[in-house]
Amino acid sequence: MAESLMDIKRKIASTKKTGQITQAMQMVSGAKLSQIEKRAKKYQIYSDKVRQIVTHLAAGQLLELANAAESDTDSGDKSQVISVASLLQKRPVKKTGYLVITSDRGLVGSYNSTVLKAMMQMIKDDHESPDDYVMMAIGGVGADFFKARGLNLAYEYRGVSDIPTFNEVREIVKTAVTMFDNGVFDELYVCYNHHVNTLTSAFRAEKMLPISDLDVSEVADTNVEYLIEPDLDSVLESVLPQYAESLIFGAIMDAKTAEHAASTTAMRSATDNANDLISHLSTQYNRARQAAITTEITEIVGGAAALE
């Protein structure tokens, strides 16, 4: 019985240490979550303004492309696509690209499994052959997952900061735009967990290339006129990649927010489970100790009675 008591004490001590670690990790994740939520709100204001400006500048190009699409059903000739509109031009989809955002490590609850499970289901539903799609992965978990299943992984990026920066995203966007221009894929979807609140996230798959979320009607009633130098085409050639960068950066910010929320929730749950286990083990220890004392008293009383 004494050995059993020692085993229980060791389990209690070990569980307490684990609980202290998970509680510290919960606090760290909570601090990161608070920080990135504040930054995400500020970034949303910037993103909305950039979208408005780009829509205004690209309005003419969008209308020209829409008219061209109506008058010419054969848009497969890529030589007809002007460089200014390369990120706006729709073309026949022979191959789809998926930029999948996951974390670099675990301890984030169901965050990664939700994205990867939904991603595999999407591939199963939308594609008949592995030649119809190509994968790009942000995060080590996703990259390792696709490699293990033999999927066509054309690009991977590991080590995104807990609070992402534009410098990190530029490399990703440059690669994605280059692959799109070179015909590696004809459309690109960014797939990630969208942050709803601390306890909830939802899988999202948003089309990023070609840029298709610009609505000319949103700026139709505005009287803003821009002084453009040297010319509109040159400005659009510079601005459109920046807009694509802002879209992907926004998705990464959203995904990182969901990751920190999932980590906070997972560590809180682990801490609560550790406390529950400590309570259970303490009760078990007290009962075992009480039984041991009772046994000793019984033996003493029995021995005294035998002497009489």
From Swiss-Prot:
Q: Which Gene3D superfamilies match?
A: 3.40.1380.10, ATP synthase, gamma subunit, helix hairpin domain
Subunit structure, as described in the record: F-type ATPases have 2 components, CF(1) - the catalytic core - and CF(0) - the membrane proton channel. CF(1) has five subunits: alpha(3), beta(3), gamma(1), delta(1), epsilon(1). CF(0) has three main subunits: a, b and c.
Membrane topology category: Peripheral membrane protein
Q: Which organism is it from?
A: Lacticaseibacillus casei (strain BL23)
Q: Name one GO biological process term.
A: proton motive force-driven plasma membrane ATP synthesis
InterPro entries, alphabetically? ATP_synth_F1_ATPase_gsu, ATP_synth_F1_gsu, ATP_synth_F1_gsu_CS
Against PANTHER family, the record matches this protein to: ATP SYNTHASE GAMMA CHAIN, ATP SYNTHASE SUBUNIT GAMMA, MITOCHONDRIAL
Q: Where in the cell is it found?
A: Cell membrane
Q: Which UniProt key words apply to this protein?
A: ATP synthesis, Cell membrane, CF(1), Hydrogen ion transport, Ion transport, Membrane, Transport
List the gene name. Answer: atpG
Summary of the function given for this chain in its UniProt record: Produces ATP from ADP in the presence of a proton gradient across the membrane. The gamma chain is believed to be important in regulating ATPase activity and the flow of protons through the CF(0) complex.
Q: Which cysteines are joined by disulfide bonds?
A: none
Look up the record and report any one GO term of the cellular component aspect: plasma membrane
Name assigned to this protein: ATP synthase gamma chain
Pfam families under this entry? Answer: ATP-synt
- Family, as annotated: Belongs to the ATPase gamma chain family.
User: Which molecular-function annotations from GO does this UniProt entry contain?
Assistant: ATP binding; proton-transporting ATP synthase activity, rotational mechanism
